[in-house]
UniProtKB/Swiss-Prot annotation:
The lineage of its organism: Bacteria, Pseudomonadati, Pseudomonadota, Gammaproteobacteria, Enterobacterales. Mg(2+) binds at residues 152, 181. Pfam families: DXP_synthase_N, Transket_pyr, Transketolase_C. This is 1-deoxy-D-xylulose-5-phosphate synthase. Keywords: Isoprene biosynthesis, Magnesium, Metal-binding, Thiamine biosynthesis, Thiamine pyrophosphate, Transferase. Binds 1 Mg(2+) ion per subunit. Binds 1 thiamine pyrophosphate per subunit. It comes from Shigella dysenteriae serotype 1 (strain Sd197). It comes from the Bacteria. Its EC number is 2.2.1.7. The gene is dxs.
Length: 620
């Protein structure tokens, strides 16, 4: 994908941050305009995260202009907002490949650029890492500076506050920038507040502030008066008391789209000692009206025509598994007022929009707080309700102790609806749902189900919802269902699989939605095909029957082979001293990079052709 860089004459001068810092300051507003247009041009042609980057253009330019990156270390939280950062740090001509197989990584990635200090993808990690990096820089003694950029959503997570509490204790020299795009620029973000921010961040004020503390430290009444006077002045326009109490010097809020004002404030703050906190207000989707009006829809986009202002509509074909879940949720809630649904900031992605509108008093979005979500569900279960935690596989990892300690040990009936299980595609290593079967299978009392199609998914959700002897989990993939008929809901027998096809020497034991591919292989090789359904408890009787009547077994799953469902089958056979050969097909022992689901399954041998080739090579 090529771009006519002549349309962006100022941006064309910037292939690195060193070149950026050679530009006269007066040219930076023009650079910001061109950078925003370039981002629109590139993402609309290739797809990617969009609205967040539009909102951080001025901040990105200002940070790289003021700080000596990559010597100074700039850390982005999550990374959705880092496309302008990639464009300014030598990757401008490759931005059209982002999120594609072999292209730029969707998030800041250490292996991609020296400018990407921390590999990210999950939220709220930046401040913790930043403290460690700042402490290391202090010990290095080369005056290397550390900056963390975190959004208003990510900063609500407990990990961010744990980190800030620690920073207030050990007081490293670092800057945390809060990119607050929750609302349009407030009344406080005007000339007075910007002037106050520059005044309070200036060297004169800081020197007087610290000097006064030392002089009057032995005179408590005067020291307390100075503290209260400062708080009163700042409190007239500053909502930063919480961050001050955590030990940060708080500045803001300031206009995050005033690049020259940001540069002045950042220059003032750059040499201040101790933990600093700059609160900026931005508009998500800034500069592209459709994204400003609907930043959720334009958060991540497919290819689209920017002149139309509309994203392409889906073809209206098969429903996604997320929609299957959402429809089941509404159907069940209408019949049972004990149902409570919980999501950690994934309402749209998890298919819960309709439920949140129909049953607002039974819908809980706990924000980016996976640990809290799970233990909150435990409390609801103790109170006699039926909680369902709708969560992506990759994010459930963040609440593992809560699943084990707060739910499973107490045998509480919490249902986990695990979306995005298996290969997710363009978001790459940080978002693949590769490990949930492995990390859940070892938990006592856990029931784990792997549907092979949307009808089975509904039946399993129903089964898990009515299972009262402990927690249960249903895992299903990103993407569309297969188009089978939906039958009336009924409970499945726990721990029982079903034979889908009878063959001869080989039996394929399938776990989950790779069933269509497994069926093609079974037909080609005249193999028996089993829908195992349950990863825990396993259908040991059926496994032993297959071992006794076949010369070899193959297990198929879209989870890490290590510790996954296939490993469970191996354990059953060894426990019963059955010397039947077993081939485990699943995700290999490395972090799977980005690419479409189809591309990655083909590369990993998880499509029908790949599975058949693996089996034939193994049998040869």
């Amino acid at each position: 994908m090529s771009f006519d860089i002549a349309k962006y004459p100022t941006l064309a001068l910037v292939d690195s941050t060193q070149e950026l810092r050679l530009l006269p300051k007066e040219s930076l507003p023009k650079l910001c305009d061109e950078l925003r247009r370039y981002l629109l041009d590139s993402v609309s042609r290739s797809s990617g995260h969009f609205a967040s980057g539009l909102g951080t253009v001025e901040l990105t330019v200002a940070l790289h202009y003021v700080y000596n990156t990559p010597f100074d270390q700039l850390i982005w939280d999550v990374g959705h907002q880092a496309y302008p950062h990639k464009i300014l740090t030598g990757r401008r001509d490759k931005i059209g490949t982002i999120r594609q197989k072999g292209g730029l990584h969707p998030f800041p990635w250490r292996g991609e650029s020296e400018y990407d200090v921390l590999s990210v993808g999950h939220s709220s990690t930046s401040i913790s890492a930043g403290i460690g990096i700042a402490v290391a820089a202090e010990k290095e003694g080369k005056n290397r500076r550390t900056v963390c950029v975190i959004g208003d959503g990510a900063i609500t997570a407990g990990m961010a506050f744990e980190a800030m509490n620690h920073a207030g204790d050990i007081r490293p020299d670092m800057l945390v920038v809060l990119n607050d795009n929750e609302m349009s620029i407030s009344e406080n973000v005007g000339a007075l507040n910007n002037h106050l921010a520059q005044l309070l961040s200036g060297k004169l004020y800081s020197s007087l502030r610290e000097g006064g503390k030392k002089v009057f430290s032995g005179v408590p009444p005067i020291k307390e008066l100075l503290k209260r006077t400062e708080e009163h002045i700042k409190g007239m326009v500053v909502p930063g008391t919480l961050f001050e109490e955590l030990g940060f010097n708080y500045i803001g809020p300031v206009d995050g789209h005033d690049v020259l004002g940001l540069i002045t404030t950042l220059k003032n703050m750059r040499d201040l000692k101790g933990p600093q906190f700059l609160h900026i207000m931005t508009k998500k989707g800034r500069g592209y009206e459709p994204a400003e009006k609907d930043p959720i829809t334009f958060h991540a986009v497919p290819k689209f025509d920017p002149s139309s202002g509309c994203l392409p509509k889906s073809s209206g074909g098969l429903p996604s598994y997320s929609k299957i879940f959402g429809d089941w949720l509404c159907e069940t809630a209408a019949k049972d007022n004990k149902l409570m649904a919980i999501t950690p900031a994934m309402r749209e992605g998890s298919g819960m929009v309709e439920f949140s509108r129909k049953f607002p008093d039974r819908y809980f979005d706990v924000a980016i707080a996976e640990q809290h979500a799970v233990t909150f569900a435990a409390g609801l279960a103790i109170g006699g309700y039926k909680p369902i935690v709708a969560i992506y596989s990759t994010f459930l990892q963040r609440a593992y102790d809560q699943v084990l300690h707060d739910v499973a040990i107490q045998k509480l009936p919490v249902l986990f609806a695990i979306d995005r299980a298996g290969i997710v595609g363009a978001d790459g290593q940080t978002h693949q749902g590769a490990f949930d079967l492995s990390y859940l299978r070892c938990i006592p009392e856990m029931v784990i189900m792997t549907p092979s199609d949307e009808n089975e998914c509904r039946q399993m959700l129903y089964t898990g919802y009515h299972y009262n002897d402990g927690p249960s989990a249903v895992r299903y993939p990103r993407g569309n269902a297969v188009g089978v008929e939906l039958t009336p809901l009924e409970k499945l027998p726990i721990g029982k699989g079903t034979v889908k096809r009878r063959g001869e020497k080989l039996a394929i034991l399938n776990f989950g939605t790779l069933m269509p591919e497994a069926a093609k292989v079974a037909e080609s090789l005249n193999a028996t095909l089993v829908d195992m359904r349950f990863v825990k408890p396993l259908d040991e009787t059926l496994i032993l029957e297959m071992a006794a009547s076949h010369e070899a077994l193959v297990t198929v799953e879209e989870n890490a082979i290590m510790g996954g469902a296939g490993s469970g089958v191996n354990e059953v056979l060894m426990a019963h001293r059955k010397p039947v050969p077993v081939l485990n097909i699943g995700l290999p022992d490395f972090f799977i990079p980005q690419g479409t689901q189809e591309e990655m399954r083909a590369e990993l041998g998880l499509d029908a052709a790949g599975m058949e080739a693996k089996i034939k090579a193994w049998l040869a």
